[in-house]
Amino acid sequence: MLDPNLLRNELDAVAVKLARRGFKLDLDLLRSQEERRKVLQVETETLQAERNSRSKSIGAAKARGEDIEPLRREVNELGDKLDTAKAALDQLQAEIRDYALAIPNLPDDEVPDGKDDSDNLEVSRWGEPRQYDFAVRDHVDLGEMAGGLDFAAAVKLTGSRFVVMKGQIARMHRALSQFMLDLHTEQHGYQETYVPYLVNHATLFGTGQLPKFGEDLFHTKPLEEESDSSNYALIPTAEVPLTNLVRDEILEEESLPLKMTAHTPCFRAEAGSYGRDTRGLIRMHQFDKVEMVQIVRPEDSMTTLEELTGHAEKVLQLLNLPYRKMLLCTGDMGAGSCKTYDLEVWLPAQDTYREISSCSNMWDYQARRMQARCRSKTEKKPRLVHTLNGSGLAVGRTLVAVLENYQQADGRIQVPEVLRPYMGGLEYIG
């Protein structure tokens, strides 16, 4: 969420920045709420001071032998008025907070304006798409030819947008995740972390999935039910538990950056995506991903975004998969991001680039919700950290890219050299 001081003191400037994202800030509502808050705050403080003063008078009057009943009645009346004023202030502050939670992050000045992905800016390309002298097959046909992708079995077990992987395809899927983890931990300085796949509502609130995006999650209980200790949701990404590890913590600045990576399944309801990418592994309810998260000092976050994106790029480069780097426009960024790069890998069967990684600087948007702070040795007051996250990479989509880019005329798949140590030295599968 945004800094409340910005909404109080720089409202017009905030409105201009949010308008770039297509978000219309209700200035009249916010100004009226703030004026009402000030009035109630003064009223509450005045009543509190007056009641305290009258309460002290009771003891003095009693010592003088005076009748204290009128004072008691007055104190009780002031207490009732104070309770009413406090309740009104609490209600108003809850309304202010609810509205603030729906406000997206402010876009960085470098982010291009735009409405959707057609307005994203291509920053760079790496690698050249291969040329084939045979009819290119897509990953579904290749996987089924190898006996490794079974969508019919998944439909029987669960439903659509799931898959059963078998044999060498399943092995390659596992090899990819192990390769990614080894790269990030051994060369990029991340600490491998194992996290729960079920998280509570406080955790989902911390990274911004709740309250706005609850319909995109799989819940153990209906979201409408009152939250308790048994209300969980399956994680949509390891970003959620990894980032929340610093919730309500004050970190020593000398310990930053904190770099974490995790390989987890991810679960998404894909609300609103009906009819999109219905064939294959591109859009699934359950998919694996290796996630990278960094917790950094505020002044380091923009440099860190470039570094983190580079770590995701390195995976694609070592796999020799052509890709392009896109700077997302204001209309295509996630609500909590101030700047996002997408990496899009070349898929021969689709003759286009498709997203395989998204790397974002969340600024202090998540940290404020989580109250995640850091403190230096020279400053007594802690300050909010900045949080960043990125896919390093989506394992299923990487498998898609390997199957399609490394296919042979006879339907076999050449195993990328960097994966061969993870696959017993195999050079081809299928």
Swiss-Prot record:
Name of one Pfam family that matches: tRNA-synt_2b
The reaction(s) this protein catalyses: tRNA(Ser) + L-serine + ATP = L-seryl-tRNA(Ser) + AMP + diphosphate + H(+); tRNA(Sec) + L-serine + ATP = L-seryl-tRNA(Sec) + AMP + diphosphate + H(+)
One MF annotation (Gene Ontology) recorded for this entry: serine-tRNA ligase activity
Residues reported to bind ATP: 268-270, 355-358
A Gene Ontology BP annotation from the UniProt entry: selenocysteine biosynthetic process
CC annotations in GO: cytoplasm
Compartment list: Cytoplasm
Keyword Secreted: no
Keywords: Aminoacyl-tRNA synthetase, ATP-binding, Cytoplasm, Ligase, Nucleotide-binding, Protein biosynthesis
Enzyme Commission identifier(s): 6.1.1.11
Family: Belongs to the class-II aminoacyl-tRNA synthetase family. Type-1 seryl-tRNA synthetase subfamily.
Role according to the record: Catalyzes the attachment of serine to tRNA(Ser). Is also able to aminoacylate tRNA(Sec) with serine, to form the misacylated tRNA L-seryl-tRNA(Sec), which will be further converted into selenocysteinyl-tRNA(Sec).
NCBIfam families listed in its UniProt record: serS
Domain comment, as recorded: Consists of two distinct domains, a catalytic core and a N-terminal extension that is involved in tRNA binding.
Protein name, per record: Serine--tRNA ligase
Species: Serratia proteamaculans (strain 568)
Gene name linked to the record: serS
